[in-house]
């Protein structure tokens, strides 16, 4: 009897619209691969009902909180339904940029200089010591919520007078915020499928940084795959990807984002354990470069579900 697969999409996070697009593409690809797949929007369908509705596996096409942060993974573990992507712990950690950075630092892996702030510090007013630490990062800099994806809530700060507004914007989305030093780029991303490392992609955007519009809406963002790195640089990036992936305990599939600094070194940005699968998405692009069609890609990801 064929497996019945739930493609979990939509949800209630700030990335709902992107998830709906990803889920629709995944559903189409799975059906093309001959898989009995069904779209399930967990905003309207309680995940606890998946077992009683006869689903054997779950393809997680959710992004952001509630779908990518270990919450749903825990429910699926309880139901004993195999699912795509990383487990509970790795999903929770990778959703949290701050704790990902702490872990990478502890493993001796390169991350951009940063200052962590919480809401209590913000409400009390940033003291002289914190401001000195932020000033030491230089300008421009980036302000990011710790636990959001798709560049939601991120601002680039070019002048000191812009910092307060950027912090207020980031704190709309989370109680913890990162203030990061600017890295000149370019930005690279590397897909991981099981034990396979996909070719790197170089991202070139017309905007100040790779924000939500550049990721999902703009036709001016350029993607280069092959990325133009030398063989030695590609090997270095591959090894960094593997080290970052393993340090956070990731499994299944995902994407590691890095930035190159002015010193020519790679610095880790974040790991996505449920990357976008839209027409602008990067893992399908890299998989295609490696000779894998979209339907082959989603079928392979589903095979890795456990």
UniProtKB/Swiss-Prot annotation:
It is an enzyme of class 6 (ligase). It catalyses: 2 D-alanine + ATP = D-alanyl-D-alanine + ADP + phosphate + H(+). Keywords: ATP-binding, Cell shape, Cell wall biogenesis/degradation, Cytoplasm, Ligase, Magnesium, Manganese, Metal-binding, Nucleotide-binding, Peptidoglycan synthesis. One of its GO terms (cellular component) is cytosol. Residues 101-303 form the ATP-grasp domain. Pathway: Cell wall biogenesis; peptidoglycan biosynthesis. The keyword Cell wall biogenesis/degradation applies. NCBIfam families: D_ala_D_alaTIGR, PRK01372.1. Binds 2 magnesium or manganese ions per subunit. Cell wall formation. Mg(2+) 2 binds at residues 270, 272. This is D-alanine--D-alanine ligase. Its cofactor is Mg(2+); Mn(2+). The keyword Endoplasmic reticulum does not apply. It is found in: Cytoplasm. It comes from the Bacteria. Mg(2+) 1 binds at residues 257, 270. Gene3D superfamilies: 3.40.50.20, ATP-grasp fold, A domain, ATP-grasp fold, B domain. PROSITE patterns: ATP_GRASP, DALA_DALA_LIGASE_1, DALA_DALA_LIGASE_2. Its EC number is 6.3.2.4. GO terms for molecular function: ATP binding; D-alanine-D-alanine ligase activity; metal ion binding. InterPro entries: ATP-grasp, ATP_grasp_subdomain_1, D-Ala_lig_Van_CS, D_ala_D_ala, Dala_Dala_lig_C, Dala_Dala_lig_N, PreATP-grasp_dom_sf. Belongs to the D-alanine--D-alanine ligase family.
């Amino acid at each position: 009897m064929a497996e019945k697969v739930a493609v979990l999409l939509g949800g209630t996070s700030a990335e709902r619209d992107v998830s709906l697009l990803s889920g629709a593409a995944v559903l189409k690809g799975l059906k093309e691969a001959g898989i009995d797949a069904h779209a399930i929007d967990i905003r309207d369908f309680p995940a606890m009902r998946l077992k009683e509705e006869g689903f054997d596996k779950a393809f997680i096409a959710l992004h952001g909180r509630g779908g990518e942060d270990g919450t749903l993974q825990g429910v699926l573990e309880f139901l004993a339904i195999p699912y795509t992507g990383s487990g509970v712990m790795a999903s929770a950690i990778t959703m949290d940029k701050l704790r990902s950075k702490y872990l990478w630092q502890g493993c001796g892996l390169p991350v951009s200089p940063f200052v962590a702030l919480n809401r209590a510090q913000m409400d009390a007013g940033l003291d002289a010591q914190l401001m000195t630490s932020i000033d030491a990062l230089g300008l421009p800099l980036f302000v990011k919520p710790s636990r959001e994806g798709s560049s939601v809530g991120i601002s680039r700060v070019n002048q000191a007078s812009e910092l307060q507004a950027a912090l207020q914007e980031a704190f709309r989305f989370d109680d913890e915020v990162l203030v990061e030093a600017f890295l000149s780029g370019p930005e690279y991303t590397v897909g991981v499928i099981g034990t396979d490392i996909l070719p790197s992609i170089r991202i070139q955007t017309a905007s100040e940084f790779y924000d939500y519009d550049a990721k999902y809406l703009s036709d001016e963002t350029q993607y280069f795959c092959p990325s133009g790195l030398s063989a030695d640089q590609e090997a270095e990036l591959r090894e960094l990807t593997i080290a970052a992936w393993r340090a956070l305990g990731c499994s299944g599939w995902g994407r590691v984002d890095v930035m190159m600094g002015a010193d020519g070194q790679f610095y880790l940005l974040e790991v996505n354990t449920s990357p976008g699968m839209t027409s602008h998405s990067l893992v399908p692009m890299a998989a295609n470069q490696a000779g894998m069609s979209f339907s082959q890609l989603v079928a392979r990801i589903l095979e890795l579900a456990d």
